[in-house]
Amino acid sequence: MSDITANVVVSMPSQLFTMARSFKAVANGKIYIGKIDTDPVNPENQIQVYVENEDGSHVPVSQPIIINAAGYPVYNGQIAKFVTVQGHSMAVYDAYGVQQFYFPNVLKYDPDQFEHRMSQPSGADLVGITPKGSVSDNLHVITPEMFGALGDGESDDFQAIQDAIDYAALHRMRVQGTGKIYAVSSTIKLKVGIKSLSHMNIIAMTERMTVLSNNDNNSDLQCDVHDNEINLNGVGLIGMLFYGIVNSGIYNNKITGLTLQDCYGIRIGILSNDFISKNNSIYNNICILGPDPDNGTGTRTMVGIALIGRYHGTHGGIEENGNLIWDQPLTVINTDVYGNYVYGGTHNIFCPGCIYTRIHDNHFEAGSHRNINTSIQSQRLLISNNKLINAGSSAIVTGNTRWVEITGNYIQSSQSSAVSSDDSAIQFGGDIDGLIIDGNTIIGDWKYGVHGAYAKRVTIQNNRIESSKANIAIESSWLSSPPSGAIYSSSRNEPYPPSTATFQINISGNLHMGTGCAIYMSQLENKELMQISVSNELINNAYSRSHCVYVFESDSKASGLSLSNINASGASYDKYFSTRGNAPFLSINNVTSLTTDIVPITSATPILFGSDMYSISSTTPITDFHYGMPGEEINVKGFVGGTIIHNAGVIRLKGGVNYVGGASAGNDIIRFKRIGNTWFEICRNF
């Protein structure tokens, strides 16, 4: 009876026929087999039972089945294997006809139902494969070897891999490597329909090639690319280049061998079409780039990760008349970049023309020019909690951008002082709007901690900053040849500067370390510097700094400045400077030494800055107090032989008579108030 498929063994679930209440054989007992949930003793309920021979043949037997003295079921006195073709009930009786067991459905106890389990939808889960996983994990997986790939690291496997991808795209399957090394001579193109590409170990063979990209005619590619290793081998140009990719993850990849000019590890977006890349995540990748042969001068481009959206290309988005133009379609949208490690090259990450980009929790190191470059025309960016190490020129640069947040980053360098360009941990310029710099730690040999120009609506707060030139420097312009008085400015070439003024800058709650000037403000090139508030700053090492606050104006166009609650223990009055004294300020309050020291007057036209207490210290006649604030009141202490000249339009003294210090002039105090452009005497103590 070879046509029978009998795989259900007639047996106790414990595989031994024993008594119910003692571990003894059911000697000379009987077994009855019937339909599920019926009494098998009743002949109407019984089903056919077979003896399975050693050759796999089956012989039908009658019931009941006899149990021998040892507890084994026998046929014609011989121990045999009894089977059925279906699930069944089973009753076991002893030699005295007493029921010992009854099982309404033996299959519930899994005596032998592998074929049944294999026939279920989850059956593929039961079959394992090498090196790991099961058949069900790989039902929709294609390998390059299925299409002829050799994977020896020398033969060209491009066509086999491309054929595998084409097939997978057509059938909505995945392509997965087998652990071998695939050498390729041409760009592998992903196509719409492929679900993922993973575990490929690829080496580039052709000069300046792109290893992995997508079909030029496809947009809305949705494909996860993960756990791949790409070696550009010193000849390849780009590891991965995707555009028009959506809702995809690029993760756990490793890209090495990047040494050429204009090379990229992972790049999303190109400038030559309007394909939209959106809702993508780039995470937990490793990109190792070779050293920049030009040592961070910015003349080369070697990028680990790039997000390149469309932007107005003329002069970095600036027209020749200085206006910033936002006229390009948004092509790189909502990208999450996190957990990546990028080492070397010129820019660890570069992302112009992007919107809704989050760059967080990455480790970027040894970018010879910048760790993070968000210029040009990116908007709504978050740069947070990154570790930025040893950028040669600047750790973070953002230019011609709006609504960028730079928060909680650790920024350290021990090599930026050797580079002549930028030299700023965080640098911004080129018509910036809505920038927040908050809670960053900046240490090392930076010349500037935070350095910006051409900006509006900027907040710089709660940062810890260490630098050698200026911790926070805000300028209205950058010049290739700054005026001599702009002592903390650096030479910068800006061939097409924005026309915007620099205004609405809030600086608050920062901790100043290092030896550089803590706060530097510079108005240059006839551009206005306005509405800058500095408050609640803590300046360490104030006594050893060249300046705590330095304000320079080349065109008297700084206005609306304010200083308040500046704690600079150990500072002296000469640690503060303003070209026009109080003139550009709305208010100065509670600034260590600046608002508390008695300031000596030795010239005919002393510049008033900060303090309200001045002491005549020479016999030079005083003809004006320069640069007072409207409504400001000052006290002037006399000096033997010292003189204040009455001039009704400049200094108006009591009775229209000059003040001349007599023998007790050291005790004289005259109080003045500025109304309009005239100082009025309001009282004296003598």
Model-predicted regions and their roles:
Residues 173, 184-187, 204-210, 230-241, ...:
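Short glycine/acidic-rich loop motifs that flank beta-strands on beta-rich extracellular proteins
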Residues 107-159:
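Fibrous stalk/shaft segments of extracellular and virion attachment machinery
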Residues 158, 162, 166-209, 581, ...:
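N-terminal extracellular ligand-recognition/capping segment immediately after the signal peptide
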Residues 174, 185-205, 214-227, 247, ...:
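Beta-solenoid repeat scaffold
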Residues 87-90, 666-675:
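Extracellular disulfide-bonded cysteine-rich modules/repeats
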Residues 1-113, 147-148, 155-173, 177-182:
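N-terminal assembly/attachment segments of tailed bacteriophage virion structural proteins
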Residues 126, 131-146, 589-652, 674-686:
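Exposed extracellular interaction/assembly regions and N-terminal maturation sites
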Residues 228, 253, 280, 285, ...:
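Consensus "Asn ladder" position of solenoid repeat domains
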